[in-house]
């Protein structure tokens, strides 16, 4: 029972909180803050009970999994705080359905991370997917939000069918859906079973779709553009971290006796993601769409770490996705503090000259952009350096050179943001009331970007 405590706790918090919010509608803000406090307590419970060994063959808990869940929950809490402060800033009523959907989505991610069985992993991913579709379309009267959510749902449903079809192949040719059983077969069978490999590839399509890696990335620009900013922070941070951990959990199945087949497939996906992400962003004017392409690019970098297939590569991948999640949250909170209700229309045009009127926010956005480029001594530099160093050390020169090349290309549009703020004509922006939750998040991000490198080094 203690092993399932994080999942049970979050489910109860979500459902009971929703019930109280419906019964006492005029106290939504108080209930919302209580739920955030309970989620913070859940972080410590998740970490505390993560040392117990798994009670089921299909469900694993260990210290590393507990740490992963705690980090994901922390990023989720940040997204919830952003939603609360954004609602206060623009004068909207807090909708408790948002926190319910997000917490249930996290339960799905937790199940997926602990899964050691393809069917259980599929169920966890689908719970996350279904709630994510609703979060993407949470702006009910917005055409772009509805369009993005519908596209996300249709493509996601198609990929889910492929994933389930893949599980049937795995069971049919492997005789089991347990990770350990399939791994034992792959390591001991003298002949490779093509049907088993096809099944694994079909199942992987679902993970790559949720990661928004190319060529399964076409949904993400429209979804980011139409979704509420709070949902976008969740998709960029907690959701992506969870899917990267899931991918690392099944990495032994991806790269085994059939190494050349799946290795080359994932290598192509990584290179395409880096190229599409880098060049696709150049023509963008919307800052939310720009970050969508930036996500595609950075997922390509993460896949480099997965392809290295060693502990150092996995550490580099996890470190990089964590740094990118923090940087993205910093960028989105700055946009909220600048534009408030008009944040969805934020573009290069709307940030022109803001350095004259919003010096602190412009400086923070600049630091975020420099970290994304990988300029030392910011934390983003050490994330990229560690990743590319491990790739070169493993003699993966193609991946390393492609990563360095696309980093140079991406520097063009990251610096374009800085140029618009400091070297363009001023456009008047109304100063909005200060929201201390957003301000605290921004200062924490700033501290991480400036001093996080010392943690990495020492």
UniProtKB/Swiss-Prot annotation:
Entry keywords, A to Z: Cell inner membrane, Cell membrane, Membrane, NAD, Quinone, Translocase, Transmembrane, Transmembrane helix, Transport, Ubiquinone
One matching Pfam family: Proton_antipo_M
Domain of life: Bacteria
One CC-aspect GO term: plasma membrane
One GO BP annotation of this record: ATP synthesis coupled electron transport
Its EC number(s): 7.1.1.-
Intracellular or extracellular location(s): Cell inner membrane
Record flagged with keyword Membrane: yes
Assembly behavior: NDH-1 is composed of 14 different subunits. Subunits NuoA, H, J, K, L, M, N constitute the membrane sector of the complex.
Similarity comment text for this entry: Belongs to the complex I subunit 2 family.
Name assigned to this protein: NADH-quinone oxidoreductase subunit N
Source organism of the structure: Rickettsia prowazekii (strain Madrid E)
Gene field: nuoN
